[in-house]
A protein has these predicted regions:
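Soluble periplasmic/extracytoplasmic beta-strand elements of cell-envelope proteins
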Residues: 17-23, 27-32, 39-41, 52-55, ...
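Solvent-exposed coil/turn segments that connect beta secondary-structure elements
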Residues: 23-26, 33-34, 45-48, 56-59, ...
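Envelope-exposed proteins and targeting segments
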Residues: 14-16, 36-38, 49-51, 68-70, ...
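N-terminal type II signal-anchor transmembrane helix
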Residues: 1-21
């Protein structure tokens, strides 16, 4: 369907320009994005990272059709009504839709659109394409220059000084957890300096425990 194709194109769009809009989505202006990002093909990303992200974010990724109904219900109640937990309900497909299409406003309408679009995206892209796109667009905090980074290649280069295809299992495990809270978990501050001992301990623990 044409609508599915348009959705795929929107999800794949990696723009260096950020659009500022009014509440009705009409355009205010366009500004250059400050994100450092280098999109790469799926075969240029280590399987270590792919496996780590699936294990961390969406263990049912290979089998679901875009959503996990029980998890969606639990997370929707948590985020909108304040009942239970609001975490753990979004598949990688839903997270990709949230980042690229619908945003993260805590409303039933937004969540419903996210679910419908996630199901549609799984019709238009295969699992490897969805995972690769997720890894190319997700925020990963800051690099060692203090610049905001998005995409696994920028994260690999900016944090470990290697390409995404060369990430080891411990490095991949560390990077896989960054999109959950990229600025908090980033080992670097806005000026490029190493952050607090607490954050560095997290990096050290993750690297040492993931052999």
């Amino acid at each position: 369907r044409s609508s599915d194709l348009e959705l795929v194109q929107q999800v794949r769009n990696v723009s260096s320009v950020s659009k500022l809009t009014y509440s009705d989505k009409s355009l205010i202006s366009e500004v250059d994005s400050d994100l450092i990002r280098t999109p790469v093909a799926g075969d240029a990303i280590s399987d270590n990272v792919k496996k780590a992200v699936i294990a961390t974010e969406d263990e049912n990724f290979e089998s679901h059709k875009g959503v996990v109904p029980k998890a969606v219900l639990r997370a929707t109640l948590g985020s909108v009504a304040g009942v239970g937990s609001s975490s753990g309900g979004s598949t990688l497909t839903q997270q990709l839709i949230k980042q690229q299409v619908v945003g993260d406003a805590p409303t039933f309408t937004r969540k419903a659109t996210e679910i419908v679009d996630a199901l549609a995206l799984e019709r238009g892209m295969d699992k490897n394409e969805i995972l690769t796109t997720y890894l190319n667009v997700s925020p990963f905090g800051r690099n060692n220059r203090g610049q905001n980074i998005a995409g696994v290649e920028a994260a690999a280069q900016g944090i470990f000084g290697v390409s995404a295809k060369d990430l080891t299992i411990p490095q991949a495990a560390f990077i896989a957890g960054l999109p959950q809270s990229p600025i908090v978990y980033s080992p670097y501050a806005a000026d490029g300096s190493l952050k607090s001992k607490e954050n560095l301990d997290r990096k050290s623990t993750r690297l040492n425990s993931s052999h």
